[in-house]
Amino acid sequence: MEQTLMDKLTILADSAKYDVACTSSGASRTARPGTVGSCYAPGCCHAFTADGRCVSLLKVLMTNCCSFDCGYCVNRRSNDIPRATFAPRELAELTMEFYRRNYIEGLFLSSAVLGTPDYTTERMLAVLRLLRGEYRFGGYIHAKAIPGTSPELLQQLGYLADRLSVNVELPSERSLNLLAPDKGRHSIFRPMKQIAVSGAASREELTLYRHAPKFAPAGQSTQMIVGASPETDYHILKLTEGMYQKYGLKRVFYSAYIPVAEDTRLPALDTKPPLLREHRLYQADWLLRFYQFEADEILDKDNPNFNPYLDPKCNWAVQHYGLFPVDVNRAPFEMLLRVPGIGPKSARRIWRARKQAALGLDELKRMGVVLKRAQYFIICRGFSGAHPGRGTAGRERITRALIDPNVFSGSCEQLSLFSPPAVDNLIGQGVPPWAAVRMVREEAVQCLAKAL
């Protein structure tokens, strides 16, 4: 039975949902006379996935027919699923029809490997040439570079797309060889390096010739799957740091592994996606990019995984409590960034405002400081800090306060997730009341963490 355009869109939009490496454009190219659409820095809007969610882009695959057999991928060769393939003109016309109806502002185009990487890339290039040339589409385009694509085709792709991305997928060569034998480390990092070098050359050329063609002006990104292989959070974070430094990536995305098929090399089908771990990786990634942290400060070989109860910044502050409290009216900018509850914007506001007058809690609150966390790590005008003491006991108390502020302040009652007899039973066994409450609340936190 011949597939309709809607059949193809339904299949290929659904097949693209596991690819998370797309966000707002990050480019500021304005419309030119005679073109359709524009690309604004705040990002794209009004795109719809197959299940009706509103997202930034039309996110779709060119095809889900794949010659690779990657164990973690729903589109792998051995998986029995409905298959579909867009013709280049079909997808170009579909994109323009969606754009004219104001459904989308851009296109996120990826693909399974149809035949060979070069053949697949040539089909993707055909779509982009139609959009940029025949239809004069000036909107945002994010294209996925297929691992193993020739440098010549990758170069052409970069001049037509606003952003390129090559997915690392798995954080070690060993896991890549085990789960994706058709891919190799070289086939992933070679195009990543080419994109970085070509992008730098393009930016340099633009300083000499203002109308020079732009190569991937919004940069490049990548994606890693979390939980499909045994690597630690420290290993993943070190790889992330290396890619930011070496290839100048704009973003690294993390995707909690969702079991899609029975495979002895992978977690069981009833395994829940490690969403809390994914969340912690994004928080640590933020520290690398905006807070001047290094991976070795956040985690190390002795503590290779994230604390499930505290975010990475709070965990670092508790472990280095000897550096606190800091005086917000005197501390260097770099130290302000390391205070829980103070972000880059509020740190800059503090830096500017304290030149005029000494700052107190009221001023800090107006500047966006989250005092619920910051109060344990700062002193300021009229406030000597809410410090729970030094040593192991002090760190334990502040940890519990950061998990649940009511535990430390005692200002109000926190309703328990469990029945009161649970506390009474522990007290009856000789456990001190404060310890009984702590044990029950720890059980509650663990239960919530597992649910995540």
Residue locations for each model-derived region?
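Long C-terminal interaction/binding lobes of large macromolecular proteins
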Residues: 1, 214-216, 234-245, 275-277, ...
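Flexible, acidic/Gly-rich N-terminal and inter-domain linker regions that tether
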Residues: 1-65, 370, 378, 386, ...
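Conserved Radical SAM active-site core
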Residues: 1-68, 72-222, 226-230, 243, ...
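A structural motif corresponding to the C-terminal lobe/cap of the Radical SAM core domain
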Residues: 177, 189-196, 227-235, 241, ...
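Long, highly charged, low-complexity intrinsically disordered interaction regions
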Residues: 265-337, 373-422, 451
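Residue-level signature of tetratricopeptide-repeat
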Residues: 353-354
